[in-house]
Amino acid sequence: MIVVDTSAVVDALAVRPVNRLVHERLAGAGDLCAPHLIDTEFLSVLRRLVRTCSLHSVTADAIRNDYAQLTILRFDHLPLSERVWELRHNASAFDATFIALAELLGVPLVICDERIASIPGLRTAIEVYPAG
């Protein structure tokens, strides 16, 4: 079981060529967990990639279908609010939500955003994979 950050899912599905290291990590992780926020963040990233012509809209539709096939256990963010607030000086509320969930579940957070790993006071393992 792991908590998967949006950056890792994007690299596993949307970055071309696909980030094989992240793809293999997610495939072998067992349960993938994330706050409900992941769905909106994922769509936001796809939108940006299409708008900046980094990704064709037809490809984005195929990636959305691949994303829909992922089995991700989604968690409400409200029980995480206190820890998210505690992290406010060093992390965005979005990043802190993923961190807080990993801490609550006692599992690693898998990311492709190395700045998150340098946040002080984290209470969980952070697995950083190079961005694709």
Question: What residue ranges belong to the model's regions?
Answer:
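Acidic, PIN/NYN-like endoribonuclease modules and their adjacent C-terminal/linker elements
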Residues: M1, I99-G132
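A cross-family signal for key residues in well-ordered alpha-helices
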Residues: V10-D11, S44, E82, A100
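Active-site neighborhoods of divalent-metal-dependent phosphate/nucleic-acid chemistry enzymes
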Residues: L70-C112
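Active-site-proximal, substrate-binding regions of enzyme catalytic domains
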Residues: L37, L43-F75, R83-W85
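Non-catalytic, well-ordered alpha-helical scaffold segments
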Residues: S7, T40-L43, D61, A96-I99
